[in-house]
């Protein structure tokens, strides 16, 4: 039974992170009517930027700010140079173009940072809670991610149904 609870808590945490990516896809879909698969590459690319800034400066927060700015720049470039011109011709062409951008961003990241995956350290404690004589795998970081997802889902629900 304990193993089941461990897996359940781990699954909730992983599912919350996947839900954040899904929310990003939905947000872009609602505004452009194009499924932008390049977002996955943009997220990976800006995470590597944040990791690099953090390694150079030691500041997690500065890495976050610079990564968000880089994400904005990359997103605007992808939208105006790839999605917008191709979407006028064909929606499926725009979707295929976003796959091309995804592949290009992955290749560029591999050239700059190498092919080995790296984990971005969490901003807060990522070790589990100790309770009832054992360590539970759900950490304060997992709670932060889950709470963020719930708040974003509720906020986007209000925006999409009230505007």
Where are these predicted regions, by residue range?
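Small-residue-rich transmembrane alpha-helical segments that form helix-helix packing/gating elements
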Residues: 1-32, 37-163
């Amino acid at each position: 039974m304990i193993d089941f609870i461990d897996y359940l808590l781990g699954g909730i945490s992983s599912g919350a992170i996947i839900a954040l990516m899904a929310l990003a896809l939905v947000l872009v879909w609602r505004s452009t009517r194009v499924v932008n698969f390049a977002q996955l590459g943009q997220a990976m690319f800006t995470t590597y930027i944040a990791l690099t800034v953090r390694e150079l400066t030691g500041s997690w927060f500065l890495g976050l700010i610079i990564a968000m700015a880089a994400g904005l720049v990359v997103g605007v470039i992808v939208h105006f140079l790839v999605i917008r011109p191709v979407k006028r011709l064909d929606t499926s062409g725009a979707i295929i173009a976003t796959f091309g951008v995804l592949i290009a961003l992955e290749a560029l990241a591999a050239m700059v940072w190498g092919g080995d995956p790296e984990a971005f350290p969490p901003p807060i404690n990522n070790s589990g809670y100790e309770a009832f004589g054992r360590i539970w795998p759900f950490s304060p970081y997992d709670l932060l991610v889950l709470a963020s997802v719930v708040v974003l889902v509720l906020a986007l629900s209000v925006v999409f149904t009230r505007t």
